[in-house]
């Protein structure tokens, strides 16, 4: 018998009394997202909507995106991937369990240096799925578009991993499972983590690098102004 989604107490900023919301809504407020099912348009739109909201609410705090999914449609995956690139904040992607097909693509699309896996997680690379069939004429047209999208995804894997296009194409032709060490060597992830404290430390390092970048930029601007005087 299913237990349903648990409710947890949450006090909305500015309110005196806490209210009970489902645990996922509570986590969203903490800037934590989950992809824990097949990726379709509905799931993708929910994730995209939350990312847009969190980015507009505060563009200085990062988002943690946990992934345990067998993948799904290419269009849905590309939508989530593009939104990760679009938002101003860092998006830390974390694989727990399995990130397969388009889910591995989203994992690789996280902020460089912040693409993570737990020790016993796996990623799986293969050809992402296309459409569902129909009349012959439309199936031919769709087949051409599916091939185009697969080629686009292969090129994006090249960009995110540093592997050659030929190797990516070859590895996508079959189910290609990787453990954390293999995924890191391949370029799909940056680190393996074992506990939440490591996530906090990586987040702190990222913020420190951003501050350093701002300081360096300020110094450059000040130097340029001095030279112009």
UniProtKB/Swiss-Prot annotation:
Question: One cellular component GO annotation, for this chain's record?
Answer: endopeptidase Clp complex
Kindly report the protein's main subcellular placement as a broad class: plastid
- Keyword set includes Transmembrane helix: no
GO-annotated molecular function: ATP-dependent peptidase activity; ATPase binding; serine-type endopeptidase activity
Indicate the enzyme's highest-level EC class: hydrolase
Q: Which UniProt keywords apply?
A: Chloroplast, Hydrolase, Plastid, Protease, Serine protease
Please, one GO biological process term? protein quality control for misfolded or incompletely synthesized proteins
The record's similarity note reads: Belongs to the peptidase S14 family.
Q: What is the protein's given name?
A: ATP-dependent Clp protease proteolytic subunit
Give the species: Mesostigma viride
Q: Supply the gene name.
A: clpP
């Amino acid at each position: 018998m299913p237990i349903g989604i648990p409710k947890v107490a949450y006090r909305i900023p500015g309110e005196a009394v806490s209210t009970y919301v489902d645990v996922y809504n509570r986590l969203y407020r903490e800037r934590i997202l989950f992809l824990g099912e097949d990726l379709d348009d509905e799931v993708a739109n929910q994730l995209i909507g939350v990312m847009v909201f969190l980015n507009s609410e505060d563009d200085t705090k990062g988002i943690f995106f946990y992934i345990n999914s067998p993948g799904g449609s290419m269009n849905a995956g590309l939508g989530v991937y593009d939104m990760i690139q679009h938002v101003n904040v860092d998006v830390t992607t974390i694989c727990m369990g399995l990130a397969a097909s388009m889910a591995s693509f989203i994992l690789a699309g996280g902020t460089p240096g912040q693409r993570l896996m737990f020790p016993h997680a796996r990623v799986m690379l293969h050809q992402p799925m296309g459409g569902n069939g129909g009349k012959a004429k439309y199936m031919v047209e769709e087949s051409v578009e599916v091939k185009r999208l697969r080629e686009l995804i292969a090129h994006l894997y090249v960009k995110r991993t540093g592997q050659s296009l030929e190797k990516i194409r070859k590895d996508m032709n079959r189910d290609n499972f990787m453990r954390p060490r293999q995924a890191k060597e391949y370029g799909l992830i940056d680190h393996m983590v074992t506990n939440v404290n490591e996530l906090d430390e990586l987040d702190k390092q990222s913020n420190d690098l951003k501050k350093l970048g701002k300081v360096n930029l300020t110094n450059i601007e000040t130097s340029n102004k001095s030279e112009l005087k």
